[in-house]
């Protein structure tokens, strides 16, 4: 490769790249908002439809499977119709889901709207990191790729905050009627309309991915965008991209197969990163955190407030990753995070393993409660500066131009399936073996992740996408 053809820090249009990456990351914001907004409405939904916990739980878990479906489908759509049209499709799904989730007649049509929104979430989880990686200069790609996770955790935080505010103003999520005669829980879902419409409108205003345009034989359009994004020796950059895309056929899932017929090793690594990101149990902390905080002695109201605070900590730690990912690299941050999660989850396993059970709930007293409170937030910190944002950075950049969208869709689909497995197995684990052994399983996954990163993941800091 000709070093002079690589974009330099002086020629890159940082403000423009940050702007268009921020628009793409709005999909991540909606991803976080949509998955978290239901938490504040669960009790009201159960009361409104008179459903049992199993059926209510399906409204959460089936949305995760919808996300897996959306992720698997987004890659082919993005390769056939482009990154921008895929964003617009996701925005439409978010908009329809937001409206429909607030106007259900039965629990079953509510589940339909949640699954539809889940498909949008899955599509956004693929297209945002792919687009950001494809428009970012190499020296900025880690920081810009981390915007995806920052947007996700910000979406979660804003959803929790808006749920809390609406419930506070209405006197409870089940308060009916409230604003304009609609129950408070309906407004929790309708709030998503604002970012969904903003995402859809802004997607019309940003340029298509230059890598996609080159693959479609539109080199002149790609060159104009690359000049605005990177500057430097654009003709050489176009030649490099042309050498790494499939010009003889449209991208397809069969490109992920090796000559022996199995998946390419890099695809397995992407799937491993996605699965381990979920198997360390981060969503247990956010989905079921009230169990943890009540066991320490907090009331339900204070438990919800602490969950909001934990979400804010997650935002701050993601900013740490943005600051250091292009300085120290991806691999060191992942290793530090894995070690931190292994230690903190191990401590939580020991602490809750010795907890007394009162009315079916683990209860901690004295120093044990304080240790659990501090350790849980240290665990969130360890995840927040490493596996939260860095996995999205790697998934966006580790695959070559020929297979990026397809491979990312497979990896993201695996991530949503792993999320579904963890979210649905935690309640029975809690009922059968308790919190201690459950955290022990997640600690084991964190320990495995250390060896996985050490032996299988290569550093990508500073490399162009054409060097992958």
Swiss-Prot record:
Question: Which residues point to the Extracellular side?
Answer: 39-58, 106-114, 171-186, 287-307, 353-366, 434-436
* UniProt main location, coarse: membrane
**Any one GO CC term of the record:** plasma membrane
Q: Which organism is it from?
A: Synechocystis sp. (strain ATCC 27184 / PCC 6803 / Kazusa)
According to its UniProt record, where is this protein located?
Cell membrane
* Stretches assigned to the Cytoplasmic side: 1-17, 79-84, 136-149, 208-265, 329-331, 388-412, 458-468
The name of this protein is Glucose transport protein
Q: Which GO terms describe its molecular function?
A: carbohydrate:proton symporter activity
Give the way it sits in the membrane. Answer: Multi-pass membrane protein
Extract one GO BP annotation from the record. Answer: carbohydrate transport
